Every structure is written in C-alpha cells, then in structure tokens.
C-alpha cells in the first residue's frame, strides 16, 4: 500500500491532478490523501501519521510537481528507505536542483545552514538532503519516529524537508536520488532540467 500525500494551500493545478489520476487508474493499492493548511510541516506530519495508521509507504507529491507514471514506477522499483526524484527550483536565475550533496545545519558556530550543490549527477546516488516534492519513504522509516515529535519541525534555518532528511540520517537511513528522470516544477512556467545553468 502506498499513500500519495499532497500538502496543499487549497488548490492543485490540473496537471498535478492528472499525474495522480494516472497512477490511480493504472496501479493498485494507492490511496491519495490531501491536507490543506498554511504550515507545510504540520501538513506533512498529518500525512505521515495517516500513512503510519494505514501501514503504508508514503509518496510525498507537492501540489506543484507534475510527474509521469514512469517516474512513479521508477521510485517504487528502487525499493530503498528514502528516494527522491530530481526536480529543480522554479525561480528564474536560481533554479538549482532541489537535492544537495551535503547539508550542514545551523549551529552556534555556523550562523546559517551550509549546503553543497550536486555538480555531477549519477543515475542513482546517495545525497544528504532532498526536497520532499516527489519523495518515497518506506513505512519502517515513518514508524521509527516517535508520535510525540514532528520530524518536519524546522531545525535552525533548514526548511521542513531538509530538517526531515537530517533526522532520517541521524536515525541511520540513507537518502537516495534517482536522476534517471526529471520532473516539472510548475509555476507560471514549468521549470525543468533544460533550465539548469550548472551553478553559473
């Protein structure tokens, strides 16, 4: 069983709805679950708890990520603790991949988080941090967190996604990136791999 969990502020583009419908029509044992709210880390925690209650793996899909059935199948096929698809930021001129080779949190001596971008992609590679826009997390990972904490609570100046990755790595889980496909990050313009300038 896989829960497709979508945190949303209230609306989802039809292209994303179409992506999810395509999976529901062509694959079995899939449950969509949508949570509306302005605090994304609370929405993600509600989705995580829903997946745990249903003894399911969890595929986070952000409400601005368009994906194909092939992309869905590739994540499932990887059969690993945590695996993300590759997508890129959607700000003009700053559209780096939303995955980082290293992620160092803010500390007393380090005033802000430090991230090291990926400069060379391998088809399948271990990373320290990914955005959760298209990320499959196995149920045993979800179950490893106490009910009393929100694993998405921002840590220092890291966002909820990288804070979650940090906690997962502290629990001994690897975070993998499947770069054999890319996703569309929707806005007024669909940013994807062809827009990436390689850190220039």
How would you name each of these model-derived features?
Residues 1-42:
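N-proximal low-complexity "stem/linker" segments adjacent to membrane-targeting elements
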Residues 48, 68-153:
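Conserved catalytic core of nucleotide-sugar-dependent glycosyltransferases
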Residues 34-36, 86, 179:
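Residue-level recognition of beta-strand->loop/alpha-helix junctions
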Residues 144-200:
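C-terminal catalytic/acceptor-binding lobe
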Residues 55-56, 80, 173:
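Short, high-confidence coil segments that cap the C-terminus of an alpha-helix
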Residues 45-57:
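Active-site nucleotide-sugar/metal-binding loop of Leloir-type enzymes
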Residues 54-66:
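Short beta-strand-to-loop acidic/aromatic patch adjacent to the donor-nucleotide binding site
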